[in-house]
Amino acid sequence: MEGDSYGNATTINGTPVNHQPLERHRLWEVITIAAVTAVVSLITIVGNVLVMISFKVNSQLKTVNNYYLLSLACADLIIGIFSMNLYTTYILMGRWALGSLACDLWLALDYVASNASVMNLLVISFDRYFSITRPLTYRAKRTPKRAGIMIGLAWLISFILWAPAILCWQYLVGKRTVPPDECQIQFLSEPTITFGTAIAAFYIPVSVMTILYCRIYRETEKRTKDLADLQGSVSVTKAEKRKPAHRALFRSCFRCPRPTLVQRERNQASRSSSHRSTSITGKPSQATGPSTNWAKAEELTTCSSYPSSEDEDKPATDPVLQVVYKSQGKESPGEEFSAEEAEETFVKGQTDKNDCDSPDYFLSPAAAHRPKSQQCVAYKFQLVVKADGTQETNNGCHKVKIMPCSFPVAKEPSTKGLSPNLSHQMTKRKRMVLVKERKAAQTLSAILLAFIITWTPYNIMVLVSTFCDKCVPVALWHLGYWLCYVNSTVNPICYALCNRTFRKTFKMLLLCQWKKKKVEEKLYWQGNSKLP
């Protein structure tokens, strides 16, 4: 052993006996190291247990993202209970006194838990990245079951990578080369192997996580800017809210028999008993043209749809007609009404070339500059045959139903053209989603930063020792390795600092107020249930 001044040996029956097993350190060093590491270990255990209990008792924390944090807390708890205390004992005693089997079990548990922390951070980074960049496709698949599968894979990969090699390497090579009073991984005795494991276990994951976080940050900032532009676009004045409706002429030839002379006479005789058209207005057709069928909307059903590029190449026999409808009892000639009362829609009109030769449809001026996003409306029309030059309608024709168009849904619908109330609701929802995304990104950034700060010193020393074996002091090795453990202490603090729900739940649990809160909630709901 080094340093005879640290020893305190006496003799019994001529045999030297060492009463001071901590001969590498002075007494004050032992007390300081033991006290500091014990406090850090206690904070690590309490913090990660709080994370687990909070996830259990608070349903607001049972989100997919927090499942990954729960897995990370499990790995950190293992490190806080076993790794920190055993490694501190090894440092203070200067030798391993628990035997080779306990050494291998500790190393396997230590490396599996540490690698699981890295894998969980990698999974969290990918989860955040896909949630931000592919919100429609990925979030539909983002379920607790899938999160459990990813967590299981992270632990399984970590176990396969380290546990068999640590426990079985001495049997593969035929002997154990690690001295009895030391505890280290046998196959990491070569600096080149140590260098390779550091690259695979730290530098590659950190590089991937950093790239993903940079992209997450850019996408979040882009969405923040887009949301600000969207909020500005929906802040219109009262004068802009009330716009005159664009009347659309709807004329299409259906399979309806040409009116006879008797029917025309009846139509002219029924001018005074007309029905108000609530949705479609038109003009009389020419006498030389074919019979024109005028439609009155009875029922409608709206559905959101968005056309693809293929829909822009429709033939003329399958026209897209723009229709403006109004609610009952609000129509008057020349009356202006707000966007809440009127909607511009697109309806596919089916025509038959054998029935007519006149143009199939007319579009209002607004239709020429219609944006890509559209709303389909399924109308139930009543065909009314009009005599030439008449203004009134006849209710004696057949009913024809125009089926809704089936356009493929686009990725992100626009709020342009919607009513102000609906636009405001959509903007508010987007803002809430963006706030949640930013909070999750902040939590990820804090965890990632803590991971890089605590793990980088040790892995730099690993690279240095590959080229210079004696350049890194033993004390610095111990400090760097212990600093990796401190990451497990910092993680719960990051959750509390970045997530208000975690912070409030931690506070209630530490102050023993959670049970009181549950009782108050129970009494509140019982009181409300008794109200008439």
UniProtKB/Swiss-Prot annotation:
Superkingdom assignment: Eukaryota
Membrane topology of this protein: Multi-pass membrane protein
GO molecular function: G protein-coupled acetylcholine receptor activity
PROSITE patterns linked: G_PROTEIN_RECEP_F1_1, G_PROTEIN_RECEP_F1_2
Stretches in topological domain Cytoplasmic: 54-66, 127-146, 215-443, 499-532
Comp. bias intervals (Low complexity): 270-279
Keywords: Cell membrane, Disulfide bond, G-protein coupled receptor, Glycoprotein, Membrane, Phosphoprotein, Postsynaptic cell membrane, Receptor, Synapse, Transducer, Transmembrane, Transmembrane helix
Region (Disordered): 263-294
Location of Phosphothreonine modifications: 501, 505
Gene Ontology terms: biological process: adenylate cyclase-inhibiting G protein-coupled acetylcholine receptor signaling pathway; chemical synaptic transmission; G protein-coupled receptor signaling pathway, coupled to cyclic nucleotide second messenger; gastric acid secretion
Compartments reported by the entry: Cell membrane; Postsynaptic cell membrane
Transmembrane segments: 30-53, 67-87, 105-126, 147-169, 192-214, 444-464, 479-498
Pfam families from the UniProt entry: 7tm_1
Ranges of Polar residues composition bias in the record: 280-294
Ranges per topology, Extracellular: 1-29, 88-104, 170-191, 465-478
Glycosylation site list: 8
Any one cellular-component term (Gene Ontology): postsynaptic membrane
Main location: membrane
Disulfide bridge positions per record: 103-183
Described function: The muscarinic acetylcholine receptor mediates various cellular responses, including inhibition of adenylate cyclase, breakdown of phosphoinositides and modulation of potassium channels through the action of G proteins. Primary transducing effect is Pi turnover.
Family: Belongs to the G-protein coupled receptor 1 family. Muscarinic acetylcholine receptor subfamily. CHRM5 sub-subfamily.
Name of the molecule in the record: Muscarinic acetylcholine receptor M5
GN (gene name): CHRM5
